Protein backbone atom coordinates (compact mmCIF):
# COMPACT_ATOMS: atom_id res chain seq x y z
CA UNK A 1 0.00 0.00 0.00
CA UNK A 2 1.28 3.44 -0.89
CA UNK A 3 1.19 6.07 1.85
CA UNK A 4 1.55 9.85 1.87
CA UNK A 5 0.26 10.37 -1.65
CA UNK A 6 -2.79 12.39 -2.55
CA UNK A 7 -4.20 10.40 -5.42
CA UNK A 8 -6.12 12.07 -8.24
CA UNK A 9 -9.83 11.30 -8.53
CA UNK A 10 -9.37 9.82 -12.00
CA UNK A 11 -6.50 8.14 -13.83
CA UNK A 12 -6.95 7.53 -17.55
CA UNK A 13 -4.78 5.16 -19.59
CA UNK A 14 -4.12 4.77 -23.26
CA UNK A 15 -3.98 1.08 -24.27
CA UNK A 16 -1.41 0.56 -27.02
CA UNK A 17 2.18 0.76 -25.73
CA UNK A 18 0.88 2.09 -22.41
CA UNK A 19 -0.93 -0.88 -20.87
CA UNK A 20 0.23 -3.53 -23.35
CA UNK A 21 3.23 -3.78 -25.72
CA UNK A 22 1.47 -3.69 -29.09
CA UNK A 23 -1.05 -1.96 -31.31
CA UNK A 24 -4.26 -3.94 -31.02
CA UNK A 25 -5.35 -2.81 -34.49
CA UNK A 26 -2.21 -3.84 -36.41
CA UNK A 27 0.04 -6.24 -34.45
CA UNK A 28 -2.50 -8.95 -33.64
CA UNK A 29 -5.34 -10.68 -35.46
CA UNK A 30 -8.64 -11.91 -34.02
CA UNK A 31 -9.91 -14.25 -32.84
CA UNK A 32 -8.28 -14.05 -29.43
CA UNK A 33 -8.32 -16.88 -26.91
CA UNK A 34 -6.97 -17.21 -23.38
CA UNK A 35 -3.57 -18.86 -22.98
CA UNK A 36 -3.68 -22.33 -21.44
CA UNK A 37 -0.82 -21.37 -19.12
CA UNK A 38 -1.80 -17.88 -17.94
CA UNK A 39 -5.31 -16.38 -17.79
CA UNK A 40 -3.77 -12.89 -18.07
CA UNK A 41 -2.38 -13.71 -21.52
CA UNK A 42 -4.35 -13.97 -24.75
CA UNK A 43 -3.23 -15.65 -27.95
CA UNK A 44 -4.23 -14.29 -31.34
CA UNK A 45 -4.95 -16.22 -34.55
CA UNK A 46 -1.22 -16.58 -35.29
CA UNK A 47 0.03 -17.30 -31.77
CA UNK A 48 1.04 -13.75 -30.83
CA UNK A 49 0.61 -13.02 -27.12
CA UNK A 50 -1.44 -10.10 -25.80
CA UNK A 51 -0.92 -9.15 -22.16
CA UNK A 52 -0.38 -6.16 -19.90
CA UNK A 53 3.12 -4.97 -19.08
CA UNK A 54 4.27 -6.80 -15.95
CA UNK A 55 3.61 -3.96 -13.47
CA UNK A 56 0.19 -2.88 -14.76
CA UNK A 57 -2.12 -5.18 -12.79
CA UNK A 58 -0.48 -4.21 -9.50
CA UNK A 59 -0.71 -0.52 -10.38
CA UNK A 60 -4.38 -0.81 -11.33
CA UNK A 61 -5.15 -2.69 -8.10
CA UNK A 62 -3.34 -0.08 -5.97
CA UNK A 63 -5.26 2.73 -7.65
CA UNK A 64 -8.51 0.79 -7.16
CA UNK A 65 -7.62 0.33 -3.47
CA UNK A 66 -7.23 4.12 -3.26
CA UNK A 67 -10.73 4.61 -4.75
CA UNK A 68 -9.38 6.22 -7.92
CA UNK A 69 -11.73 6.11 -10.93
CA UNK A 70 -9.88 4.24 -13.70
CA UNK A 71 -10.60 4.84 -17.39
CA UNK A 72 -9.31 4.02 -20.85
CA UNK A 73 -8.94 6.54 -23.68
CA UNK A 74 -7.70 4.91 -26.88
CA UNK A 75 -7.77 6.14 -30.46
CA UNK A 76 -7.49 2.58 -31.78
CA UNK A 77 -9.00 1.77 -35.15
CA UNK A 78 -10.12 -1.57 -33.66
CA UNK A 79 -12.23 -0.67 -30.61
CA UNK A 80 -14.10 -3.98 -30.83
CA UNK A 81 -10.85 -5.93 -30.47
CA UNK A 82 -9.53 -3.68 -27.70
CA UNK A 83 -12.68 -4.27 -25.65
CA UNK A 84 -12.69 -7.96 -26.53
CA UNK A 85 -9.10 -8.30 -25.27
CA UNK A 86 -9.93 -6.48 -22.03
CA UNK A 87 -12.94 -8.77 -21.54
CA UNK A 88 -11.06 -12.01 -22.24
CA UNK A 89 -7.92 -11.19 -20.26
CA UNK A 90 -8.35 -12.43 -16.67
CA UNK A 91 -6.36 -10.64 -13.97
CA UNK A 92 -6.49 -10.59 -10.17
CA UNK A 93 -8.95 -7.93 -9.01
CA UNK A 94 -9.73 -7.74 -5.31
CA UNK A 95 -8.38 -11.25 -4.76
CA UNK A 96 -10.04 -13.18 -7.60
CA UNK A 97 -9.57 -13.54 -11.35
CA UNK A 98 -11.87 -11.24 -13.29
CA UNK A 99 -11.95 -9.69 -16.77
CA UNK A 100 -9.41 -6.85 -16.96
CA UNK A 101 -12.14 -4.52 -18.23
CA UNK A 102 -13.66 -4.57 -14.72
CA UNK A 103 -10.86 -2.29 -13.53
CA UNK A 104 -12.22 0.51 -15.70
CA UNK A 105 -15.33 2.61 -15.05
CA UNK A 106 -15.22 4.17 -18.52
CA UNK A 107 -13.68 2.71 -21.68
CA UNK A 108 -13.55 5.22 -24.53
CA UNK A 109 -12.03 3.60 -27.60
CA UNK A 110 -12.46 4.91 -31.13
CA UNK A 111 -10.31 6.74 -33.71
CA UNK A 112 -10.10 10.47 -33.19
CA UNK A 113 -8.95 13.09 -30.76
CA UNK A 114 -8.34 12.23 -27.12
CA UNK A 115 -10.07 15.53 -26.38
CA UNK A 116 -13.36 13.84 -27.34
CA UNK A 117 -12.61 10.84 -25.13
CA UNK A 118 -11.95 13.13 -22.17
CA UNK A 119 -15.02 15.25 -22.77
CA UNK A 120 -17.15 12.10 -22.60
CA UNK A 121 -15.40 10.89 -19.44
CA UNK A 122 -15.91 14.30 -17.85
CA UNK A 123 -19.57 14.55 -18.90
CA UNK A 124 -20.40 11.03 -17.72
CA UNK A 125 -18.39 11.07 -14.48
CA UNK A 126 -18.69 14.70 -13.39
CA UNK A 127 -15.00 14.61 -12.48
CA UNK A 128 -13.19 17.91 -13.05
CA UNK A 129 -10.45 17.76 -15.69
CA UNK A 130 -7.98 19.08 -13.11
CA UNK A 131 -8.60 15.92 -11.07
CA UNK A 132 -7.58 13.68 -14.01
CA UNK A 133 -4.15 12.25 -14.81
CA UNK A 134 -3.56 10.74 -18.26
CA UNK A 135 -0.83 8.23 -19.17
CA UNK A 136 -0.06 7.81 -22.87
CA UNK A 137 2.95 6.95 -25.02
CA UNK A 138 2.26 9.58 -27.70
CA UNK A 139 3.19 13.21 -27.10
CA UNK A 140 0.53 14.42 -29.59
CA UNK A 141 -2.08 13.46 -27.00
CA UNK A 142 -0.71 16.14 -24.69
CA UNK A 143 -3.49 18.25 -26.21
CA UNK A 144 -5.70 17.19 -23.28
CA UNK A 145 -3.67 19.55 -21.08
CA UNK A 146 -5.74 22.36 -22.65
CA UNK A 147 -8.71 20.92 -20.75
CA UNK A 148 -6.76 20.95 -17.48
CA UNK A 149 -5.79 17.26 -17.48
CA UNK A 150 -2.33 16.35 -16.15
CA UNK A 151 -0.54 14.49 -18.96
CA UNK A 152 2.35 12.09 -18.50
CA UNK A 153 4.05 10.67 -21.54
CA UNK A 154 5.09 7.08 -20.93
CA UNK A 155 8.67 6.87 -22.06
CA UNK A 156 10.02 3.64 -20.53
CA UNK A 157 9.42 0.63 -22.75
CA UNK A 158 8.46 -1.92 -20.09
CA UNK A 159 7.06 0.02 -17.16
CA UNK A 160 4.46 2.65 -16.53
CA UNK A 161 5.86 3.65 -13.13
CA UNK A 162 2.75 5.60 -12.21
CA UNK A 163 3.40 5.33 -8.49
CA UNK A 164 6.75 7.11 -8.84
CA UNK A 165 5.02 9.79 -10.88
CA UNK A 166 2.35 10.29 -8.26
CA UNK A 167 4.93 10.50 -5.48
CA UNK A 168 6.76 13.22 -7.39
CA UNK A 169 3.81 15.20 -8.77
CA UNK A 170 0.92 14.97 -6.34
CA UNK A 171 0.64 16.60 -2.94
CA UNK A 172 0.62 14.44 0.15
From Swiss-Prot:
Any one GO MF annotation of this record: metal ion binding
Keyword Hydrolase: yes
Source species, domain of life: Eukaryota
Catalytic residues identified in the record: 14, 16
Cellular component GO terms held in the UniProt record: cytosol; nucleus
Entry keyword set: Cytoplasm, Hydrolase, Magnesium, Metal-binding, Nucleus
InterPro entries referenced in this protein's UniProt entry, alphabetically: HAD-like_sf, HAD_sf, HAD_SF_ppase_IIIC, MDP-1_euk, MDP_1_eu_arc
Pfam families: Acid_PPase
Binding-site positions, Mg(2+): 14, 16, 137
Family: Belongs to the HAD-like hydrolase superfamily.
Name listed for the protein in its UniProt record: HAD-like hydrolase superfamily protein P8B7.31
Organism, as annotated: Schizosaccharomyces pombe (strain 972 / ATCC 24843) (Fission yeast)
Amino acid sequence: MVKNIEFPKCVVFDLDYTLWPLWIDTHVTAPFKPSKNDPGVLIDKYGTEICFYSDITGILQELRNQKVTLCVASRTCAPKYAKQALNLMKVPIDGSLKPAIEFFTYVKAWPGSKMDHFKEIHNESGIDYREMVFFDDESRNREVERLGVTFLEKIKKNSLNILSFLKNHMHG
